[in-house]
Amino acid sequence: MAMLEYLPPTDPWTEIIFEDDHILAVNKPSGLLSVPGRLPEHHDSMWSRLQEQYPEIQVVHRLDMSTSGLMVFAKNKRAEAALKKQFQYRLTHKVYYARVWGHVEADSGMIDLPLICDWPNRPMQKVCHEHGKPSQTAFQVAKREVHANGAQTTIMRLLPVTGRSHQLRVHMQALGHPIVGDEFYAQGDAFTFSERLELHAAELSFYHPKSHWLRSLFVPCDFYPDAEEMIFSYFDPARKLPDYKSLPKS
């Protein structure tokens, strides 16, 4: 399923929310690729924009083009290796917000559905109990909404345990409440409700690659301004980077 037209937002060109000698964090807008695509017309990306000012900048994780929010980059190879290892061992934690179609009945829960690439329709993913990779997403209802036109939506706080491609989007669809504006997994009114995918990476916790102390970063959510810095209310990681020899490899 090819991208029909790529018109990424340009104002602001970059929005840096934190920077030191080792890491740089930005608020990536919806509609901008995390890294360049294969075609020349898809070169514009969060990474390529940062590289104009930071030639040594390194990618350590990605967000879907349509997802907005927090991305952390490494400013040198040593920081890149340290951060990538944390993602590999699932030492990072993330909090997302999503507006989904309809009112979700349960106040909280865990979605445990294995995912696999829907190869004929790639990059779409699908639930596959036989061949899919284990995928878990905890969720909490933040707010149930009724709009002026009668439409019902729910603001969801999503806490991914695993990090599969399109995981949050497919899990919400499987729950019966697709994320509004989702060009792959929402249909009809759920798709047309919003001009963008209303999925935002708000918080990330990790261990600083130099000091090895736990820290977190937060980016406010445009479509849910009540989002607050609360990641350590949901996760309780060690305050200092653990010994990798004591950890199971993801």
Swiss-Prot record:
Top class in the EC scheme: isomerase
SUPFAM superfamilies per UniProt: Pseudouridine synthase
CDD domains: PseudoU_synth_RluA_like (cd02869)
This protein's UniProt keywords: Isomerase, rRNA processing, tRNA processing
Residues of the active site: 64
GO molecular function per UniProt: 23S rRNA pseudouridine(746) synthase activity; RNA binding; tRNA pseudouridine(32) synthase activity
UniProt name for this protein: Dual-specificity RNA pseudouridine synthase RluA
GO terms under biological process: enzyme-directed rRNA pseudouridine synthesis; tRNA processing
PANTHER family on file: DUAL-SPECIFICITY RNA PSEUDOURIDINE SYNTHASE RLUA, MITOCHONDRIAL RNA PSEUDOURIDINE SYNTHASE
E.C. designation(s): 5.4.99.28, 5.4.99.29
Coiled-coil residues: none
Record family assignment: Belongs to the pseudouridine synthase RluA family.
Reactions this protein catalyses: uridine(32) in tRNA = pseudouridine(32) in tRNA; uridine(746) in 23S rRNA = pseudouridine(746) in 23S rRNA
Known function: Dual specificity enzyme that catalyzes the synthesis of pseudouridine from uracil-746 in 23S ribosomal RNA and from uracil-32 in the anticodon stem and loop of transfer RNAs.
Protein's organism: Vibrio vulnificus (strain CMCP6)
Keyword presence, Zinc-finger: no
